A protein has these predicted regions:
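N-terminal cap/lid segment of alpha/beta-hydrolase-fold proteins
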Residues: 2-21
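Conserved HGGG/HGGXW glycine-rich cap/lid loop of the alpha/beta-hydrolase fold
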Residues: 20-90
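Conserved acidic catalytic loop of the alpha/beta-hydrolase fold
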Residues: 101-119
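Conserved hydrolase catalytic core segment
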Residues: 117-159
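Alpha/beta-hydrolase
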Residues: 160-236, 243, 263
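Short beta-strand/loop motif that positions the catalytic acidic residue
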Residues: 241, 247-249
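Acidic catalytic loop of the alpha/beta-hydrolase fold
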Residues: 252-256
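Catalytic active-site module of serine/aspartate enzymes centered on a nucleophile-bearing elbow/loop
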Residues: 271-312
Length: 312
């Protein structure tokens, strides 16, 4: 009898930040590599980060872990609040449930649970803004910062709207699917289609497979998304970022304007901007090699020194 194959991912772990429990897992391949934590986007759980992309990062020398943001996936979901629409949450003067600082501290709690003193960060969409805030709030815990398809980490509320394509938000608002596992899969496919580059054939089979692996309600749980997007930042501006920074943005991003990436790169000292051709608000397979190579090149510019090894 042949032995069972080794699972690709570790069993789900739970990190704690106060009353919030954060679900995370770790790629079993190259577990002895350089720590790299992947931060996910609005309404997306960790399973939306493609396995193949994570394995490619591992082959580049990284120990890859990912986690569900609070109010996403298997992490703690907070009680309902008055605001039920993510766009409406941008108009509020203060967040109703938690702060952006809380979300930054979540990432550090996951790192602590993994036993990592410091890590490279790769944040996508909302995760990119959270990653910037982690680097501002806990610079000694961050080796390098890669932000992809994100807005500047020090903006919130109405200031966010200047970076968002409102026509795409309107299309999201018109999506209607049953509140069932099957409806969640269809919602995931529809969202993936809206966020893909129009200059590349949409891979519906891949989108359906990804949605089928994680048919939770995140993609159409507007209350949870409202709490996430309503979390406000009270810390320093991104000009204070001191970690080596790479800014990635799809040239065809239909949700966050590429100008957002240009602003981040201009404002963060020493940051480098890479615009990805034929890429939308997504991590498509044709771009995996380029993204992984850029993250590796950034890491090679900053070997972990004493500052990176110390705790705050």
């Amino acid at each position: 009898m042949s032995p069972s194959p080794t699972p690709l991912w570790s069993p789900v772990g739970r990190a704690e930040n106060g009353a919030v429990r954060l679900a995370y897992d770790r790629l079993q391949e190259r577990a002895d590599g350089e720590p790299l934590l992947v931060l996910t986007g609005l309404g997306a759980n960790r399973l939306w980060i493609p396995d193949g992309f994570c394995r490619l990062l591992a082959r580049r020398g990284f120990a890859v872990a990912r986690y569900d943001q609070r109010d996403g996936g298997e992490s703690t979901h907070l009680p309902p609040t008055a605001t039920r629409n993510p766009v409406a949450a941008l108009f509020r003067k203060r967040g109703e449930a938690y702060t952006a600082e809380d979300m930054a501290d979540d990432a550090v709690a996951v790192m602590a649970a993994l036993g990592w003193e410091s890590a490279h960060l790769l944040g996508v969409s909302l995760g990119g803004a959270v990653a910037q805030r982690v680097a501002l709030r806990h610079p000694r815990r961050v080796r390098t910062l890669t932000t992809m398809a994100a807005v500047p980490g020090d903006v919130h509320g109405l200031r966010t709207l200047c970076y968002i394509r409102t026509s795409t938000l309107a299309r999201f608002a018109r999506l209607r699917f049953p509140d069932t596992p099957e409806g969640a899969v269809e919602a995931g496919v529809a969202v993936s289609r809206l966020l893909a580059s129009p200059r590349r054939p949409f891979d519906e089979a891949a989108a359906r497979e990804a949605a089928g692996r994680n048919p939770d309600r995140g993609m159409h749980d507007q209350q949870a998304q409202s709490r996430q997007i309503g979390a406000q930042w009270h810390g320093p501006p991104i000009e204070a970022l001191s970690r080596p920074t790479l800014v990635l943005h799809g040239e065809d991003d239909p949700l966050i304007k590429p100008g957002a990436g240009r602003v981040i790169a201009r404002r963060v000292p020493g940051a480098r901007l890479v615009l990805l051709p034929r890429v939308g608000h997504e991590i498509p397979e044709p771009a995996w090699d380029r993204i992984a190579a850029e993250v590796r090149a950034l890491a090679d510019t900053s070997a972990p020194g004493p500052a990176a090894a110390r705790r705050d």
